Curated annotation (Swiss-Prot):
Source lineage: Viruses, Varidnaviria, Bamfordvirae, Nucleocytoviricota, Megaviricetes
Keywords recorded for this protein, A-Z: ANK repeat
InterPro entries: Ankyrin_rpt, Ankyrin_rpt-contain_sf
Residues in ANK repeats: 108-137
Protein name: Putative ankyrin repeat protein L38
Lineage top rank: taxon: Viruses
SMART domains assigned: ANK
Length: 189
């Protein structure tokens, strides 16, 4: 069964959903840009763990209504939505939010990576680091260790060792290139 629902707001969107859970969200259609945190459509979809709805709303906003995008995400801040996706394991929605700054810090000093570590979500930690989240802070390792998330702690240590090896290779190779060039320069004079 195909259901089309539209809501009245600053823009008129048509949504297609084949989910009965979706109908619980219809009360939030009246004001999709409501500044109250828990009366926001996308926030409710995230909290209720409806990734197909989050993805669909994000896709429509991203592709069709950039001006609506700014109004929707500026009220709570992109980091709040991102943190909620991390907290509720909505992996697919991360692609939308990655286009924003992945290392943004909310008013409590938390980044999405910190939220993923605290929730023990190793898959999300890996995705965030793959997308460029900064993991080179001592606080990150201590946080994983303190919360007893061994899999995350081991992953972070392995990633750190890997990045240090890469850094050392680059530094050592650059140094040997410099030495070669200096010797050539000295010999040429």
């Amino acid at each position: 069964m195909v259901t089309y629902i539209s809501f009245i707001g600053e823009s008129q969107f048509n949504f297609y959903f084949a989910s009965k859970k979706f109908f619980r969200l219809t009360k939030y259609f009246r004001d999709p840009i409501n500044s109250k945190k828990f009366e926001n459509l996308i926030k409710q979809a995230i909290i209720r763990k409806l990734p197909h709805i989050v993805n669909y709303i994000s896709m429509i906003i991203k592709n069709n209504k950039p001006e609506f995008n700014n109004k929707l995400f500026d009220n709570l801040g992109i980091n709040e939505y991102f943190r909620q996706c991390v907290k509720h394991n909505i992996y697919n929605a991360i692609d939308y939010f990655v286009s924003k700054d992945i290392n943004t810090v909310n008013e409590y000093g938390k980044t999405p990576l910190i939220t993923a570590i605290k929730s023990g979500n190793c898959i999300m930690v890996k995705k965030l680091i793959d997308y460029g989240a900064d993991f080179n802070k001592n606080k990150i390792y201590k946080l994983a260790f303190d919360h007893r998330h061994n899999d995350i702690f081991i992953f972070l240590i392995d990633k750190k060792i890997e990045s240090d090896k890469t850094y050392n290779k680059i530094r050592n190779n650059f140094g040997s290139i410099c030495n070669t060039n200096i010797n050539e320069l000295v010999e040429s004079k």
